[in-house]
């Protein structure tokens, strides 16, 4: 069993060779779009300054000769900025989905190995994740608030579960766009892993904002929305989530704020319903 798991992990790591470059490409695009938003903001400020300067010189009762045109320009520029920001959210979701697909693939194979499958059977089986949108993320603004993984029921074993955190938006610092977005697969302090964001993507002004590569990480069909409901609140996946260690837990995944957790729990953790049930069973 240990040899099978090690073999699966070794093969799995080889599939991650292109992930850094693919993720960096997406965040380079986000960086270029951020520069475009900055340019739009400067144009908005320039138009507004014309109006404000005229008011200071002629008073607020005398309209600027081009006031209507300037206000129209400002509204159009704001709409452009909103559209670009939405595109940035879509790109971030695409990167997140790609990383989640890789994690789910490993979870699924390890879960199968734990049920008697051999490494050869797992690695020779058709790759379900290569052709199926098994990430549950939509690039639309509706899903941007979730910014989380879509927990998989297939990874019911404790070792296969992961606690995940929301996407952290990058910031422009000294002209470099810092966009944290890589995953850490192991957390030695608990039975579940935890994804940690810590990567950067540098601005490349010559890159086209709408550029794509033949080796696109995620296809459009991978962007289908996850309609699964989790937690006591029966909402979709968003923010930080933690898995109940009861393999038969009805809900399995919970939003940390809903269960009163400020930080990921150490060791075994059960939801309130499972804790109550264990007390009943113990009587």
Curated annotation (Swiss-Prot):
Residues 137-224 are annotated as: Disordered. GO terms for cellular component: NuA4 histone acetyltransferase complex; nucleus. Zn(2+) 2 binds at residues 244, 249, 271, 274. It holds the Pfam family ING. It comes from the Eukaryota. The keyword Zinc applies. It is found in: Nucleus. Zn(2+) 1 binds at residues 231, 233, 255, 258. Residues 181-216 have a biased composition (Polar residues). Its main location: nucleus. The record marks 230, 241, 245, 253 as: Histone H3K4me3 binding. One of its GO terms (molecular function) is methylated histone binding. Disulfide bonds: none annotated. Signal peptide: none annotated. The keyword Zinc-finger applies. Component of a histone deacetylase complex responsible for the deacetylation of lysine residues on the N-terminal part of the core histones (H2A, H2B, H3 and H4). Histone deacetylation gives a tag for epigenetic repression and plays an important role in transcriptional regulation, cell cycle progression and developmental events. Has a role in silencing of mating type genes. Belongs to the ING family. PANTHER family: CHROMATIN MODIFICATION-RELATED PROTEIN PNG1, INHIBITOR OF GROWTH PROTEIN. Interacts with H3K4me3 and to a lesser extent with H3K4me2. Component of a histone deacetylase complex. The PHD-type zinc finger mediates the binding to H3K4me3. This is Chromatin modification-related protein png1. The gene is png1.
């Amino acid at each position: 069993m240990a040899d099978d798991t090690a073999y699966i992990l070794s093969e799995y790591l080889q599939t991650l060779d292109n992930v850094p470059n693919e993720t960096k490409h997406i965040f380079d695009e986000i960086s270029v779009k951020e520069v475009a938003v900055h340019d739009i903001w400067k144009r908005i400020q320039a138009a507004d300054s014309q109006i404000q300067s005229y008011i200071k010189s002629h008073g607020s009762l005398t309209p600027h000769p081009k006031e209507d045109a300037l206000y129209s320009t400002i509204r159009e520029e704001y709409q452009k900025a909103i559209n670009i920001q939405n595109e940035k959210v879509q790109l971030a979701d695409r990167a997140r989905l790609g990383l989640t697909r890789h994690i789910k693939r490993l979870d699924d194979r390890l879960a199968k190995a734990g049920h008697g499958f051999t490494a050869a059977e797992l690695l020779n089986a058709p790759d379900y994740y290569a052709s199926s949108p098994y990430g549950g993320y939509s690039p639309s603004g509706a899903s941007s608030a979730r910014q989380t993984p879509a927990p998989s029921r297939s990874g019911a074993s404790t070792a296969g579960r992961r606690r995940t955190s929301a996407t952290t938006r990058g910031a422009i610092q000294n002209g470099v766009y810092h966009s944290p977005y890589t995953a850490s697969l192991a957390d030695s302090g608990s039975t579940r892993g935890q994804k940690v964001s810590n990567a950067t993507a540098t601005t490349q002004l010559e890159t086209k904002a709408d550029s794509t590569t033949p080796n696109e990480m995620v296809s459009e069909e991978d962007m289908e929305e996850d309609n699964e409901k989790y937690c006591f609140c029966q909402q979709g996946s968003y923010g930080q989530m933690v898995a109940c260690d009861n393999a038969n837990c009805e809900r399995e995944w919970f939003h940390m704020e809903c269960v009163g957790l400020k930080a990921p729990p150490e060791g075994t953790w059960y939801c309130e319903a499972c804790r109550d049930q264990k007390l009943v069973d113990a009587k």
